[in-house]
Amino acid sequence: MFKDYYAILNITPKASAEEIKYAYKKAALETHPDRVSPSARARATEQFQLVNEAYYVLSDNSRRAQYDRESASSSAKPRQSFFSRTNPQPQSQSQQGGPSFGFRQSFSDSQFEQVFNEMMNETSTRGIANAFWTIVGTLAGAALGFITFDVPGVLVGSAAGAKLGRIRDTHGKSAYSVFQDMPAVEKARILTQFLSHLLNSSKQFTSS
């Protein structure tokens, strides 16, 4: 099935790269399965995966140009999605021939992790990153043994610094991996704070 990736991100085909990235952040935060109630999680997961498909295609100039050419073609659209045909295929596929649910979710999490780390850096002076770190410190204490750059030790609250997205613990865990291990209520709170910050930021786009 040929999917309208511009519609999925709520942007026009004329959207700039910056507008595409902003739209992805907004849509990914809105649909992230960890931000919604358990009853809405299945639907959110489906939407989150579609949002990540769209960003994968539209964030790359070459893939976007190819997608635009196929969208404009008067010939019948391919039955398989553009994402399925251009993304490296996993070993296991769904019965429909596309990537399996597990692969799509793993891909979505991996792509979102990059943006999550970026948002951690962007909000380090606005309290969200510090709130994240305070939660981590409360939950795990000194056992995590976080290291940032060349400074070892446990870093909680404001001591976490401005580069939390780069932090690894002694076992090589990224900040996003730590986030994924948080209780559901804390994950939802962090994602909602990120979304609120994005919507209230000075730079917003209207590409509808």
Swiss-Prot record:
It holds the Pfam family DnaJ. Residues 88-100 have a biased composition (Low complexity). One of its GO terms (molecular function) is unfolded protein binding. Residues 67-100 are annotated as: Disordered. One of its GO terms (cellular component) is endoplasmic reticulum. Coiled coil: none annotated. The keyword Transmembrane applies. It is a single-pass membrane protein. The chain crosses the membrane at residues 127-147. Residues 72-87 have a biased composition (Polar residues). It is found in: Endoplasmic reticulum membrane. GO terms for biological process: chaperone-mediated protein folding. Its main location: endoplasmic reticulum. Keywords: Chaperone, Endoplasmic reticulum, Membrane, Transmembrane, Transmembrane helix. InterPro entries: DnaJ_domain, J_dom_sf. Residues 4-71 form the J domain. Belongs to the DnaJ family. This is Uncharacterized J domain-containing protein C63.13.
